[in-house]
Curated annotation (Swiss-Prot):
GO terms for biological process: apoptotic process involved in development; establishment of mitotic spindle orientation; left/right axis specification; lipid transport; phospholipid efflux; positive regulation of apoptotic process involved in development; positive regulation of distal tip cell migration; positive regulation of engulfment of apoptotic cell. Multifunctional polypeptide with two homologous halves, each containing a hydrophobic membrane-anchoring domain and an ATP binding cassette (ABC) domain. Belongs to the ABC transporter superfamily. ABCA family. ATP 2 binds at residues 1411-1418. The gene is ced-7. This is ABC transporter ced-7. ATP 1 binds at residues 580-587. Residues 546-777, 1379-1603 form the ABC transporter domain. The lineage of its organism: Eukaryota, Metazoa, Ecdysozoa, Nematoda, Chromadorea. Gene3D superfamilies: P-loop containing nucleotide triphosphate hydrolases (3.40.50.300).
């Protein structure tokens, strides 16, 4: 039932996506119906059944004499004209039997005598061997470009394989020269045994040209000569032949239409096939692995996609097939319906099969394009005859081939006028491949593709799949070739340990609760840092739902040890935090726990179930929120939750309640029916958290759940996690240390794949902490450096060992050691006295006079106290681990130097190279920025042009898959077509020789029409030969029965009648079926054999051999067929070349690297012109290769100039259109698919539709012209393909000048050029600022309904600095400030996102812009960086309007980097665009400053998130500008790397003339970097000032933490605190059994730090607790209050700045 529920859910999901993806629905359903609809309508309308004319043929004679040469007959070329009226011809001959040479010479002498007259002299010439004869014949053939004559001197050659007069045996072959215009069909039996005639009006068949080539007359002459040699005196009789009459056949447009079904439905289903391939590949990339962890069945995943795609096909089927069933004859509707539906199902399964190989949509689309085209080509090229049953079975393994065979079987029944239905579909299966067998093969295809898709998916989803895993399903035990992070004993699991793990595993399986008593030691942490693991007896006995034992994960592709012997336990009721630097192995650990990847070694149990052995059971208990957002853009919030809820198998009746509770908790309930694509980044993360929690998952894995969220949103999620953890086990990773501190009941710290520390926050801080942090804000009027020195002296006077920390603008930090805590109160009293300017206070009595005299110059505005954070602890632990690993590494290297046989191994993720950053490199960067770029004007434009060319070249070189499909595949496809013209057959090639024996026309019926007792001897012998052969069925008829009646009675019979014999006016006539290609020469040999009296063992057999000028004798395919293939192949080839151009444009734009380039000041004209020129050069190079191929294959040799013109026109008409429409798409793969559909599918369908309409129906010429003109204008591929067909058709008879006439190719060229001009004009128009501004306004109005902002608090104190800032902006000169924003307003419809914003940022200032999601930050940044236009107001950078082409340094929220460039290349390209002369040195300097030298030459796609952010920061610092804008510059970076970025930005602020403006969701970052901070709410500025000023003005509480000695103290301490501090609020929940209790104490106006700290100190001493903490409101709390999200209003958890506890 659970599988069926999954299937229904997935089907529902696909249905919802179908309804909302209107563009795809248009292409998948409406366009095929529009293409097929008119055709079906015309077919049905013209479905009147008519009868073809009855054909009765006259007889003719083959005499084997000169009379045959000059015989004239209607509609057939006489022999002598083929010989160009030559009077002397030669026939060469040779005998393979030397003993029969004299006999052969005599026979050929008689042969020559038969062809002597006044008009013709035929001579014979003997050659020594067959090879010699062939050489002579080939050399004698005329050159095709010299004459149209088929021969020179030699008319033919004869090879006698056996001549035995005694035994009456003759076996020979006639050798004929092949001409291009002649078609012999040597590999085929008949062209169409049944149905209406194709119009044979001649009594003598013209194809194959047995008569015209003189084959028949030479054959009869040779055999008659042999008869005279065997039977002297035998009469020389002619053979009278007559074609069997052809009866009237019923005909209609339906039968003709059905013949084209394989091509029509291949085009129609192509869109469905592409779409299912794209959708599955897209989901394989992100969503499917996530849903699999939630319990998704792979089979149901593919089944749902296939069923939905099939249902879409079914809609098209209903529109196109059902109407045909009402006008069809002979074939039951059920048979046709089942056939087409089976094909549709097989086609979509083929798309799913191809998609199973990929998790990248671009590669999948290219693969399906080639694969589907190949399947169609194979089905067209290699189709066997229906009577070749074994070949048909092999051919039917291709779904298109099986469908073609089924259609051919249906057409066969319709032509035979026999009833076909599902009950008789296997009839005549022994004679030909029936419809039944075709359907069986389609079922086989469906099965093998379905199984193949599941197998390939299983292999691909084994994330670390290698060939070794096919044969080794156990974890490797030999680690000698594995990189080692620390020591061998930590990761090499010996047999004793392995057995112990197995025993404990058995215990868990027998008793799941036994897992709670297992406590694996944290050997890793203790082995690196002594005492880094806290011992907690209560936790050891708690129930652990997650147990990880000795987890090892080694990526076989790189050898990197991602996780190295990790062991941990996460217990129920707690939120366990997993911390680590980027690349430490956190995500790999999560994926292993969730069962997404398979560990190399170790064991993981979830709720007592083994992840490796019982994945189904474990997935029922897991809820996961990965780092990325596994969301469907077109599903709403509630629909995502419904999908995940159902996959988890939870009770459906509880869904609504569960969903509403979770959405309400994270403040997302108002977005319940909003699509995911319209959600902000923070909202998407909230949704992912809810997806992890819904369905009562017992184990919840949250991988950076709050990444990208603003503090308010983070608080919502934290509150939810705190509430939900009571009955769950939550394991969470984060880079926000304050979040880890707030949520973490237990903290695990990883480094280099190992667990290096674990314990509570308090334990880790106590073990690795540094002290308290005193933050003082100095007044702007004084000398801040002098005041900083005085302040430091004051602090060291009262608190020994106090140290000066960092200084941010007017804000200075002082580090106070924890051990000196008792000295804090006097220090606070002194600072309060200084702030009040009370210099006579008693607190200064012991202060030295020199220092006391300077107190008046120390002007303080405010101060506050916080404690060292968990972030500082994390950095300290990381430094200690690095030192420990380096020490062990050095020790190992020393050991290896003594034992060279052991290789030196390097831990994954560990870099022993020291940091290259230094003050010297920072200063060099500042000096470079001060000098500015050296190039300007034309020189800068040239540099920009070169950089774009380099960028595109690097992209092309790295994208081998794209280059392969864009360049190599088109060349290969064209080469394959060309190779068909060069493939030749040798002497034994089956395509050049055919044996003309009776078996070639078996099985067959024979019309035997004689009166009883009047059968001549010759006919009697002929009948004996037939019966001896066994493959003929003789049907006896009376001569009174007319032949037309006989053939009419045989309509549809199998096998058909091919030969016969009758008496007509006392003359014996041989009858033959005109539709069988090789029946005439076969029949003549059989008759001459019958004339040999005395024995039926006589044998006469002939054969035909075709030779050509070359030694390989003949082409495999005629040139006409090559010409037919060339046009559609060129359409496909040029579509593949040009449509791929769009992918780079969209990828560059969507990743915002294009925007980064525009921020260098480059003109859009320069930018796109360079890109267009590069694409033109690449296109030209490809066309040059095509030109060489055209020359090599002699295609359109005389009209190559016209061909090249159309190549140019195709580029000119299609590429500007591709550039213009690229702005409509966000997905490169979707754009590529739609363009391929436009260029190939729709154009091909248009070609096919026009062909069918013109061939089947009669419509007015003016309507034809309009239809063709519309297609040619809107479809350049159609015009191009039509021109190629015209050149192929008329190129041999018309000169180039006439080919370019309007009626031939001129119209195509003009319409393609017109479309190109229109497309280019549209593209240029889109580059104008006024057009983009207009489109932006239209777009913003459209999006206005998606905005929502929290209400603003009404009780906040007014910040006077806001009005002061407005006044300053209106009076300041914009050129004197780095940035001036004056009355900036941006409206979206009725919603105002930015409301008259006024700001001024000075040089050397770091300005922070804060606000919740929707407050206007992103909109402001978009206006400043030119991504959108303001509705009113202005913004000036360095005195210039931001809408101008100016240089801006910008680090966006999401890394604007091209994945296929290296970090170095990205910086070099942008530096060159900025105009730096030595751009490589500039990029090197940036890499030095951001610490990325070691990774500079790695592709961006292989960077971690932190490494990408470093490069993005480097890109911002690269710009020679007065303004650097940073949007969350350290998001996703681990704390250590974050501090390094801060250091660089601080240096930049202090030592350059540039100003910094940033926004961040990390309040620590804002405090560390910003000299001023502004807060936005509802688009308006509500507060501005330094961080301490904002905290002092808006901070409204303190946080007190008391640490207990034992749990039984809790109730007593809580009660006493409530008594002593009645206004305090306990924030530690009763379900949390921690010994650290937190209270929130409201801040009052009269509070001062000295009194408050002294009071808490006394309270802690009276209560007898172990430790205490008192801290002020954090900046985050202040921000939340300003945003209306503080705890007093929202009842959320405290967010205070604490980290360390001190002893009483």
């Amino acid at each position: 039932m659970n599988r069926l529920r999954q299937f229904s859910l997935l089907l529902w999901k696909d249905w919802v996506l179908l309804r909302r993806n209107k563009v795809w629905t248009l292409f998948e359903l409406i366009i095929p119906c529009l293409l097929l609809g008119p055709l079906v309508y015309l077919v049905v309308k013209n479905a009147d059944h008519t009868s073809s004319p009855e054909n009765i043929y006259d007889n003719f004679q083959v005499k084997g004499t000169v009379e045959d040469v000059f015989l004239e007959s209607n509609f057939i070329k006489p022999i002598y004209k083929r010989w160009c009226l030559r009077s002397d011809v030669v026939v060469g001959y040779t005998s393979k039997d030397a003993a029969a040479k004299r006999t052969v010479d005599d026979l050929m002498k008689k042969f020559a005598e038969r062809f002597q007259s006044a008009k013709l002299k035929l001579s014979v010439k003997n050659e020594s061997s067959e090879e010699q004869l062939l050489t002579v014949l080939r050399n004698d053939l005329p050159m095709l470009n010299e004459t149209f004559c088929a021969i020179n001197s030699y008319a033919a050659g004869v090879v006698f394989d056996e001549v035995d007069v005694t035994n009456k045996k003759l076996n020979y072959r006639i050798l004929l020269g092949k001409t291009p215009e002649e078609t012999w069909h040597l590999t085929e039996t008949s062209y169409n045994p049944y149905g209406p005639s194709s119009g044979r009006y001649s009594r003598i068949p013209s194809s194959p040209p047995y008569w015209t080539s003189a084959f028949l007359t030479f054959q009869h002459a040779i055999e008659s000569s042999f008869l005279s040699s065997v039977q002297s005196g035998a009469p020389d009789l002619p053979i009278t032949l007559r074609g069997l009459p052809e009866p009237r056949y019923k005909t209609s447009s339906v039968s003709a239409f059905i013949d084209f079904f394989p091509f029509i439905w291949a085009f129609v289903t192509f869109i469905n096939v592409i779409h299912i391939t794209r959708e599955i590949a897209a989901e394989n990339h992100a969503v499917k692995p996530y849903l699999t962890a939630m319990g998704l069945s792979t089979f149901m995943f593919y089944a749902a996609h296939v069923v939905m795609a099939f249902l879409k096909f079914f809609v098209i089927f209903l529109c196109s097939i059902i109407p045909l069933t009402f006008v069809m004859e002979f074939v039951s509707p059920a048979a046709l319906i089942v056939t087409v539906l089976m094909y549709g199902l097989g086609a979509v399964i083929f798309g799913a099969f191809v998609a199973s190989f990929f998790n990248n949509t671009n590669s999948a689309i290219k693969a399906i394009l080639v694969a589907w085209g190949a399947m169609i080509g194979i089905s067209y090229k290699l189709r066997p005859e229906l009577d070749q049953i074994s070949s048909c079975f092999l051919y039917g393994l291709n779904i298109n081939g099986a469908f073609a065979l089924a259609v051919e079987a249906i057409s066969d029944y319709m032509r035979r006028e026999r009833e076909l239905n599902l009950t008789n579909m296997f009839n005549d299966s022994s004679l030909h491949f029936s419809l039944g067998w075709a359907l069986v093969m389609m079922i086989v295809d469906i099965l093998w593709m379905s199984i193949g898709a599941l197998v390939v998916d299983h292999i691909r989803t084994s994330a670390d799949f290698s060939l070794r895993t096919l044969f080794d399903f156990e974890a490797p035990e030999d680690d000698e070739n594995q990189t080692d992070g620390v020591t061998a004993q930590n990761t090499r699991i010996n047999e004793q340990v392995r057995n112990r793990v197995r025993r404990s595993d058995m215990e868990i399986q027998m008793n799941p609760m036994a897992s709670t008593s297992l406590n694996p030691p944290n050997a890793d942490s203790d082995s690196l840092l002594e005492g880094s693991t806290e011992a907690d007896g209560a936790r050891d006995t708690a129930r652990a739902d997650i147990i990880v034992r000795n987890l090892v994960k080694i990526w076989s592709t790189t050898g990197e040890r991602a996780v190295d012997g990790l062991s941990l336990r996460a217990v129920r009721g707690q939120c366990s935090i997993l911390l680590g630097h980027n690349g430490a192995g956190k995500s790999t650990t999560f994926s292993s726990i969730a069962g997404i990847i398979r560990p190399t070694n170790g064991r993981i149990t979830i709720c007592g179930y083994d992840v490796g052995n019982e994945p189904g059971e474990t997935r029922r208990h897991i809820g996961m929120c990965p780092q990325y957002n596994p969301l469907y853009d077109q599903l709403t919030v509630s629909e995502h939750l419904k999908l995940v809820y159902g996959l988890k198998g939870a009770r459906e009746k509880d869904f609504k309640q569960d969903m509403k509770r979770l959405l309400s908790d994270v403040k997302l309930d108002f977005k319940e029916n909003e699509k995911a694509v319209n959600l902000s980044g923070g909202m998407k993360r909230k949704l992912c958290v809810c997806m992890a929690l819904i369905g009562d998952s017992e184990v919840v894995l949250l991988d950076e759940p709050t990444a990208g969220m603003d503090p308010g949103a983070r608080q919502d999620v934290q509150k939810l996690v705190e509430r939900e953890k009571a009955n769950r086990t939550i394991l969470l990773t984060t880079h926000y240390m304050d979040e880890a501190e707030r949520l973490g009941d237990w903290v695990f710290i990883m480094s280099h794949g190992k667990l290096v520390a674990s314990g509570t926050n308090q334990y880790l801080k106590q073990k690795f902490g540094t002290g308290y942090l005193l933050t003082v804000v100095l007044d702007h009027n004084g000398d801040k450096r002098k005041m900083a020195v005085i302040l430091t002296d004051v602090c060291t006077h009262y608190v020994k060992e106090a140290e000066r920390g960092e200084m941010h603008g007017q804000q200075i930090e002082i580090i106070l050691p924890e051990a000196r805590k008792k000295e804090f109160v006097p220090l606070f009293q002194a600072l309060e006295a200084i702030q009040d300017r009370n210099y006579r206070s008693n607190v200064f009595d012991n202060m030295p006079n020199t220092l006391k005299s300077q107190l008046a110059t120390l002007e303080m505005r405010s101060f506050g106290l916080s404690l060292n954070t968990l972030e500082q602890v994390f950095i300290t632990i990381g430094d200690k681990v690095d030192k420990a690993i380096a020490s062990r590494q050095n020790s190992r290297i020393s050991h290896n130097s003594r034992n060279a046989s052991e290789p030196s191994l390097k831990p994954a993720g560990y870099d022993t190279q020291s940091s290259t950053k230094s003050a010297d490199s920072y200063q060099k960067l500042m000096d470079s920025q001060a000098r500015g770029p050296e190039k300007s004007g034309v020189a800068k434009m040239v540099a920009q042009f070169i950089s774009i060319m380099r960028k595109k070249f690097l992209y092309s070189r790295r994208n081998w898959a794209q280059l392969f499909t864009q360049v190599l595949i088109p060349i290969i496809l064209l080469g394959l077509v060309g190779s068909l013209t060069t493939l030749k057959s040798n002497n034994t090639d089956q395509f050049s020789v055919r044996s003309l024996t009776p078996s070639g026309i078996e099985p067959s019926k024979v019309v035997w029409r004689f009166e009883n007792g009047t059968i001549p001897e010759e006919a009697a012998n002929f009948e004996k030969i037939l019966r001896k052969s066994g493959g003929f069925e003789v049907l006896n008829y009376n001569t009174k029965n007319p032949l037309p009646n006989i053939t009419k009675s045989l309509i549809g019979e199998m096998p058909p009648a091919t030969i016969g014999m009758t008496m007509n006016s006392d003359n014996l006539e041989a009858l033959f079926n005109m539709r069988y290609y090789h029946v005439l020469p076969t029949l003549i040999s059989m008759i001459n054999r019958a004339r040999l009296t005395g024995t039926v063992d006589a044998e006469i057999s002939s054969g035909v051999f075709l030779y050509s000028k070359s030694t390989s004798n003949s082409n495999l395919l005629p040139s006409q067929l090559i010409d037919v293939l060339l046009a559609p192949m060129l359409i496909l080839i040029f579509a593949m070349v040009t449509s791929t151009f769009v992918m780079f444009l969209i990828e560059e734009r969507t990743c915002q690297f294009a925007h980064q380039q525009f921020l260098t000041g480059i003109s859009p004209i320069t930018f796109y012109s360079a890109s267009l020129i590069y694409d033109g050069i690449l296109y030209s190079l490809i066309c040059l290769i095509f030109l060489f191929m055209f020359l090599a294959f002699h295609w359109m040799y005389d009209h190559l100039a016209i061909v090249i013109l159309f190549w140019f026109l195709y580029f000119f008409s299609s590429v500007p259109f591709i550039y213009a429409v690229s702005f409509l798409f966000q997905s490169p793969s979707k754009a590529n698919v739609l363009l391929i559909i436009w260029q190939v599918v729709i154009s091909g369908a248009a070609l096919l539709a026009v062909f069918l309409i013109f061939m089947i129906f009669n419509i007015d010429e003016w309507l034809k012209s309009i239809l063709v003109n519309i297609f040619m204008f809107l479809l350049p591929s159609y015009a191009f393909g039509s021109a190629i067909i015209t050149i192929n058709t008329y190129g041999m008879i018309l000169p180039s000048e006439e080919l370019m006439n309007w009626d031939h190719c001129g119209k195509n060229a003009w319409l393609m050029g017109t479309f190109g001009v229109c497309s280019f004009a549209l593209f240029v128009l889109l580059q104008f600022k006024f057009v983009r501004r207009f489109l932006s306004q239209v777009w913003t109005v459209r999006r206005s309904s998606h905005n929502n902002v929290q209400p603003m608090m009404g009780d906040l104190p007014v910040c006077e600095s806001v009005s002061e800032e407005r006044e300053r902006v209106h009076r300041v000169n914009s050129q004197n400030s780095a940035l001036v924003i004056k009355d900036l307003t941006k409206t979206f419809g009725r919603f105002t996102a930015v409301n008259e914003l006024c700001l001024a940022v000075d040089q050397k200032e770091c300005f922070g812009l804060l606000g919740v999601n929707g407050a206007g930050k992103t909109t402001t940044f978009n206006i400043l960086t030119g991504q959108s236009f303001a509705s009113s107001g202005e913004a000036m950078i360095g005195g210039r309007d931001v809408t101008e082409l100016i240089s801006i340094g910008y680090c966006p929220q999401f890394d604007a980097l091209m994945l296929d460039l290296t970090g170095r290349e990205s910086l070099e390209i942008l530096a060159q665009m900025h105009g730096f002369e030595n751009y490589k040195a500039k990029a090197e300097l940036i890499l030095e400053c951001v610490g990325m030298i070691a990774h500079a030459d790695k592709l961006v796609r292989f960077y971690s998130g932190g490494q990408k952010r470093k490069i993005s920061v480097g890109v911002a610092l690269l710009a020679p500008t007065q303004m650097i804008i940073l949007d969350e510059p350290t998001a996703g970076i681990d704390p250590k790397a974050r501090r390094e970025v801060w250091e660089l930005l601080l240096w930049c602020r202090e030592h350059s003339n540039s100003a910094l403006m940033l926004t961040s969701h990390s309040m620590d970052e804002c405090e560390a970097l910003c000299s001023r901070i502004a807060v936005l709410n509802r688009g308006s500025l509500i507060a501005i000032g330094s961080s301490q000023e904002l905290k002092s003005l808006y901070g409204n509480n303190y946080t007190m933490t008391l640490s207990l000695y034992e749990p039984n103290q809790r109730d007593m301490v809580v009660q006493l605190v409530q008594t002593r501090l009645p206004n305090s609020v306990l924030k530690t929940t009763s379900t949390n059994k921690t010994l650290n209790l937190k209270w929130q104490i409201p801040k009052e106006k009269e509070d001062c730090w000295s009194a408050k700290f002294e009071m808490v100190q006394a309270l802690a001493k009276d209560l007898g607790v172990k430790d205490f903490i008192l801290a002020q409101s954090s900046l985050e709390e202040t921000f939340l209050r300003l945003a209306g999200l503080d705890e007093d209003q929202l009842d959320t958890h405290s967010t205070v700045e604490i980290s360390h506890s001190t002893h009483v």
